[in-house]
């Protein structure tokens, strides 16, 4: 099993990065792992911590319509270059917490995605260099108020509500380029989304390079790589689970705000 890097909070409120062991004990690191954090002698057992989102980025850069089938279901052409937008860090929540349905919207959709974790400051770089700046991978749900997205024209409000970026549950360093991403609702065994991540229009190295030519990415920043076809509405009480082979599962429940 690949090493799983987590971010946790102990009962006293202290926040740590750590390595999740098969026993679910966490070996605490002395710094974020992408900043060369090293293992310490401190071990926390499952009853003594709660898992947080695996990083605390300065920004979340997301990519729209990066799977051709999703662009088609949205009734739009595939972009000729990456379509990027921002989500605020305050939208992040960990796995096993609640997505809050905002009263301003009548249509909130799930969007299961692969997330990249940036490990080093990167600015104006080539795809080859960009690949070396991707420290690891996790799972995201780019929750979207679809009606507000259409109403507003630009996406800040639709994508930016608190709780609209479930992220986690941990980070892995390596990922099979053909890993499958699937999204499930409630107890249905049939996925509502299913695609291999190598079906992206613009792969991760190209995305990071493109973004770096616009804005500097910092260690711990997050890049959301787009969602495949199959997006649809969430209802109050729904449980939405995004799975990526080689990483794990990200699960959240929809609740009233």
Give the positions of each predicted feature.
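N-terminal non-catalytic cap/leader segment that marks the start of a structured domain
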Residues: 1-82, 174, 182-184, 188-191, ...
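N-terminal accessory regions of nucleic-acid-interacting proteins
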Residues: 123-137
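A structural-propensity feature for long, helix-poor, extended segments
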Residues: 95-115
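Residue-level recognition of short, solvent-exposed, well-ordered loop/turn junctions
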Residues: 62, 109-111, 218, 235-236
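Catalytic-pocket segment enriched in acidic/His residues
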Residues: 46, 50, 70, 101, ...
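Structural signature of FAD isoalloxazine-binding scaffolds in flavoprotein oxidoreductases
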Residues: 78-95, 110, 241-245
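A glycine-rich (often HGG/GG-containing) alpha/beta subdomain
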Residues: 27-29, 34, 86-99
């Amino acid at each position: 099993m690949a090493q799983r890097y987590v971010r946790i909070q102990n009962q006293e409120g202290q926040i740590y990065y750590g390595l999740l062991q098969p026993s679910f004990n966490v070996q605490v690191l002395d710094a974020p792992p992408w900043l060369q954090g090293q293992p310490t002698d401190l071990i926390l057992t499952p009853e003594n911590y709660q898992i947080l989102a695996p990083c605390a980025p300065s920004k979340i850069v997301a990519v729209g319509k990066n799977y051709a089938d999703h662009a088609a279901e949205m009734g739009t052409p595939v972009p000729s270059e990456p379509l990027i937008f921002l989500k605020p860090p305050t939208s992040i929540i960990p796995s096993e917490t609640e997505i809050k349905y905002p009263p301003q919207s009548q249509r909130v959709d799930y969007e299961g995605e692969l997330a990249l974790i940036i490990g080093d400051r990167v600015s104006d770089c080539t795809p080859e260099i960009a690949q070396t700046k991707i420290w690891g991978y996790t799972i995201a749900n780019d929750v979207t108020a679809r009606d507000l997205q259409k109403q507003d024209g630009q996406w800040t409000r639709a994508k930016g509500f608190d709780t609209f970026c479930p992220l986690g549950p941990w980070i892995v360093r390596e990922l099979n380029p053909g890993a499958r991403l699937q999204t499930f609702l409630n107890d249905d065994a049939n996925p509502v989304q299913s695609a291999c991540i190598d079906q992206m229009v613009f792969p991760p190295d190209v995305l990071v390079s493109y973004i770096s030519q616009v804005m500097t990415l910092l260690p711990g920043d997050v890049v959301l790589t787009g969602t495949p076809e199959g997006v649809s509405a969430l209802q109050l009480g729904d449980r939405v689970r995004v799975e990526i082979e080689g990483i794990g599962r990200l699960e959240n429940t929809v609740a009233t705000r």
